[in-house]
Amino acid sequence: MVKAPKGWRHRTRHIYRKRVREKGAVPPLSLVLIDYKPGDKVIIDPNPAIWSGLPHRRFCGKVGEVVGKRGKAYLVKVRDGDVYKTIIVRPEHLRPFKQ
């Protein structure tokens, strides 16, 4: 038997994939230049072309609340089961949440 991979990006073949019309390394500048304030709701939408600040696959598509900023990245509080976790995500992997 072949040993299953245990890497950080394993089981991400379809999650970290761009559709045909989204291909390219540069994210839309309108999404990157948004300045989020603490308390803003955001959707974690990973851009697989940019590896820095990429969140774990467990948090893909989750809605979180911006807690603060650390360097260029944002601290986002996300619910994972019964526990709230604070993750560090770069703005290329965030979208504003519209209610």
From Swiss-Prot:
GO molecular function: structural constituent of ribosome
InterPro entries: Ribosomal_eL21, Ribosomal_eL21_arc, Ribosomal_eL21_CS, Ribosomal_eL21_sf, Translation_prot_SH3-like_sf
Pfam families for the chain: Ribosomal_L21e
Keywords assigned: Ribonucleoprotein, Ribosomal protein
GO biological process, one term: translation
Coiled-coil region(s): none
Transmembrane residue ranges: none
GO cellular component labels: ribonucleoprotein complex; ribosome
Sequence similarity: Belongs to the eukaryotic ribosomal protein eL21 family.
Annotated HAMAP family: Ribosomal_eL21
Protein name as it appears in the record: Large ribosomal subunit protein eL21
Organism for this UniProt entry: Ignicoccus hospitalis (strain KIN4/I / DSM 18386 / JCM 14125)
